[in-house]
């Protein structure tokens, strides 16, 4: 079996890379691909350990990056959702010749909440450790719980969960080692101090109702990164590209064309 990552490439135009989040796979982006492939050459990857790349594995962001570099286009617009936002941000910081613009979706430079040295909103560490424990026992149920958590608060929560579940089940299930490694990244990674080093234009997209990346994060980063752009989807929770698909795509297109 090949040890390279699975990529799906379609459309014509400037290169645009879509990176999914924890427990998911590239199929979550199908609506986005359908809308954008008339204007972009869209590259959708299954990250190591997920979907059609379930046979691969990576322990940290740089290991993921090294596997992405094998087939990633140069000078592309990178769009990363949730954990994928950490991956895309890491690419912009450490492999900047591959990234012309950076878009993070419902993502945070530090997913875990902290009280010290300053208050930082995010996922409570005990929630992340509970997911880790549950994952060892029953990873399918854990992923389903995470899907429900992602959609919670959105007016279309039931439809969002259904779409996420269909996407995950349409491809091979993720491997448990990669799921654990991903949770460790969500718990441990903190890119806040590195963000000002990003040299490419950056757009940060958020869902107003997101329970995993609280809207306060958008405000804090807006102050810390005044040169970046941000947009908040008022009806969305953690998956604005599904809940407000048309508005999401139009934000991407207008940022790409600037």
From Swiss-Prot:
Pathway: Cofactor biosynthesis; biotin biosynthesis. It is an enzyme of class 3 (hydrolase). Monomer. NCBIfam families: bioH. GO terms for cellular component: cytoplasm; membrane. Belongs to the AB hydrolase superfamily. Carboxylesterase BioH family. GO terms for biological process: biotin biosynthetic process. The active site is at 82 (nucleophile), 210, 238. Residues 16-244 form the AB hydrolase-1 domain. Its EC number is 3.1.1.85. PANTHER family: AB HYDROLASE SUPERFAMILY PROTEIN YCLE, MONOACYLGLYCEROL LIPASE. This is Pimeloyl-[acyl-carrier protein] methyl ester esterase. Keywords: Biotin biosynthesis, Cytoplasm, Hydrolase, Serine esterase. It is found in: Cytoplasm. Substrate binds at residues 22, 82-83, 146-150, 238. The physiological role of BioH is to remove the methyl group introduced by BioC when the pimeloyl moiety is complete. It allows to synthesize pimeloyl-ACP via the fatty acid synthetic pathway through the hydrolysis of the ester bonds of pimeloyl-ACP esters. GO terms for molecular function: pimelyl-[acyl-carrier protein] methyl ester esterase activity. Its main location: cytoplasm. Pfam families: Abhydrolase_1. The keyword Cytoplasm applies. The gene is bioH. It catalyses: 6-carboxyhexanoyl-[ACP] methyl ester + H2O = 6-carboxyhexanoyl-[ACP] + methanol + H(+).
